[in-house]
């Protein structure tokens, strides 16, 4: 089963926290991290089965938009990322998140 990567980029930290919370509650995904981009941009990253990641990203977008001042800047899902990406980008399952892995 392919392990997909889902990302939501927001403007503002409260919106990304709301998105992350909704994402892990809506589907069987694991939150693997977040990245502060600068200028108020923050990206949250989840991993899981393709259909679960799709559902979680949709839920995260809806929730982030409800935050006062929250703005979703971009979303993306990579269904089957190449294994090399895991060693270069911050999308790996780390020891800290392993206990939450489905």
UniProtKB/Swiss-Prot annotation:
It is found in: Carboxysome. Changing residue 95 to A: Form hexamers poorly. InterPro entries: Bact_microcomp_CS, BMC_dom, BMC_shell, CcmK, CcmK-like_sf, CcmK/CsoS1_BMC. It comes from the Bacteria. Its main location: other. It holds the Pfam family BMC. One of its GO terms (biological process) is carbon fixation. Gene3D superfamilies: 3.30.70.1710. Residues 4-90 form the BMC domain. Probably the major shell protein of the carboxysome, a polyhedral inclusion where RuBisCO (ribulose bisphosphate carboxylase, rbcL-rbcS) is sequestered. Assembles into hexamers which make sheets that form the facets of the polyhedral carboxysome. The hexamer central pore probably regulates metabolite flux. Homohexamer. Stacked hexamers, with the concave faces together, have also been crystallized. Interacts preferentially with itself, then with CcmK1 and CcmK4a in vitro. May interact with CcmL, this occurs at very high CcmK2 concentrations. Interacts with CcmN and CcmO in the carboxysome. The tight homhexamer forms an irregular pore with an opening about 4.8 X 6.5 Angstroms. Belongs to the bacterial microcompartments protein family. CcmK subfamily. This is Carboxysome shell protein CcmK2.
